[in-house]
Amino acid sequence: MDKKASRIRRATRARRKIAELGATRLVVHRTPRHVYAQVIAANGSEVIAAASTVEKAIREQVKYTGNIDAAKAVGKAVAERALEKGVTVVAFDRSGFQYHGRVAALADSAREAGLKF
């Protein structure tokens, strides 16, 4: 099993558990160059809020889009957008990525901005 298949297996297992809870989830995806975050409704069919380093507003705030500072900016932005829509409690879906570095930084900044998980 290669690295990507292992990550997808971990992500699938976590998503199944979150689906059983029936919770709105904060999904994180990272690539070497960008960080993406979405708040997805409990039914899985609606994206309530989203933010990424691809967006011009966030890209202008940071020096480089693939580092911890960029992840913090994305976490803050997605949390503010979710709170505007009335979402305060989410389950954190790290998409099989290790809770470390950019993933942890995004989670911490989303918590500081007001999301609870």
Swiss-Prot record:
The keyword RNA-binding applies. GO terms for molecular function: 5S rRNA binding; structural constituent of ribosome. InterPro entries: Ribosomal_uL18_bac-type, Ribosomal_uL18_bac/euk. The keyword Nucleotidyltransferase does not apply. GO terms for biological process: translation. GO terms for cellular component: cytosolic large ribosomal subunit. Part of the 50S ribosomal subunit; part of the 5S rRNA/L5/L18/L25 subcomplex. Contacts the 5S and 23S rRNAs. Belongs to the universal ribosomal protein uL18 family. This is one of the proteins that bind and probably mediate the attachment of the 5S RNA into the large ribosomal subunit, where it forms part of the central protuberance. This is Large ribosomal subunit protein uL18. The gene is rplR.
